C-alpha cells in the first residue's frame, strides 16, 4: 500500500514538473508580430493607401535606415539589415496589398521598370507617359516611375490648395544626417520639387 502511494506521488510530481517546464517555455517565447493579410484591406484606393501607410509605419517602428542591399520582403528585412529605399518600399506595399506575391520586387532605372518576377498576373496596367508631371493626369493610388530621377513613389491625390500629395519611401521619408533614418514614410506630404520632373510611366492597380 505504501509502495503504491509512493509511486503515485512520484508520478504526480513528475507530471507537475513537466507541466511547469511547458508553461515556462511558452512564456519565454516572444509573441510574433501580427502580419496583415491582403484580405484585411478593402480592394479600393483607400485600402491600397492604408496598406502603404502600414508599411511606412513599420519602417519607423523597426528603426529602418535608407540604403540598398534590402531584402525581398519586409519581414525578412526586419530580421536582417533593416534597410529600405523607394523601390523596396513600393514593392513591399504591393506585396502587403496582394498585387505582388511575397518576395517579388521591382526597381526603376533610366525611366524603365526592372522587375524580379515574370508577370504582374494581370493585376496592373502599365501606362507609358514621358511627360512633365504638371501635364500628366494622375489617379489617386497611381505608382509613379520618374524619367529624369531614379525614383518611384505613390500619388495620393490633391489637398484643398490643389497641391499634389504623395507617399514616399525614399530618402524623403527619412531624417537628414549621416544615417538617413525613417520617420515619415507613412505620412502623406506635398513634394513641390517633383513638379519640374518628368513622369516616365504609371503603374495603375486595376480595380481601384
For each predicted feature, which ranges?
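N-terminal capping segments
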Residues: 36-103
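Gram-positive cell-envelope targeting signals
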Residues: 1-38
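Aromatic- and glycine-rich peptidoglycan recognition patches
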Residues: 39-44, 124-133, 148-208
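Short, basic/aromatic beta-hairpin or loop at an interaction surface
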Residues: 99-125, 157
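Structural motif
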Residues: 139-142
Amino acid at each position: 500500500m505504501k509502495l503504491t502511494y509512493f509511486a503515485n506521488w512520484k508520478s504526480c510530481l513528475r507530471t507537475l514538473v513537466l507541466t511547469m517546464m511547458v508553461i515556462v517555455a511558452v512564456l519565454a517565447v516572444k509573441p510574433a508580430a501580427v502580419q496583415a493579410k491582403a484580405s484585411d484591406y478593402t480592394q479600393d484606393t483607400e485600402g491600397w493607401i492604408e496598406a502603404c501607410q502600414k508599411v511606412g509605419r513599420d519602417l519607423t517602428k523597426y528603426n529602418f535606415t535608407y540604403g540598398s542591399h534590402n531584402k525581398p520582403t519586409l519581414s525578412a528585412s526586419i530580421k536582417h539589415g533593416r534597410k529600405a529605399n523607394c523601390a523596396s518600399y513600393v514593392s513591399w506595399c504591393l506585396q502587403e496589398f496582394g498585387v505582388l506575391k511575397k518576395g517579388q520586387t521591382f526597381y526603376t532605372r533610366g525611366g524603365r521598370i526592372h522587375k524580379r518576377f515574370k508577370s504582374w498576373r494581370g493585376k496592373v496596367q502599365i501606362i507609358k507617359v514621358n511627360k512633365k508631371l504638371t501635364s500628366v493626369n494622375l489617379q489617386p493610388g497611381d505608382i509613379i516611375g520618374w524619367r529624369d530621377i531614379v525614383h518611384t513613389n505613390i500619388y495620393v491625390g490633391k489637398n484643398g490648395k490643389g497641391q499634389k500629395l504623395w507617399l514616399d519611401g525614399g530618402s524623403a521619408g527619412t531624417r537628414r544626417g549621416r544615417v538617413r533614418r525613417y520617420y515619415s514614410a507613412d505620412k502623406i506630404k506635398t513634394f513641390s520639387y517633383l513638379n519640374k520632373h518628368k513622369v516616365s510611366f504609371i503603374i495603375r492597380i486595376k480595380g481601384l
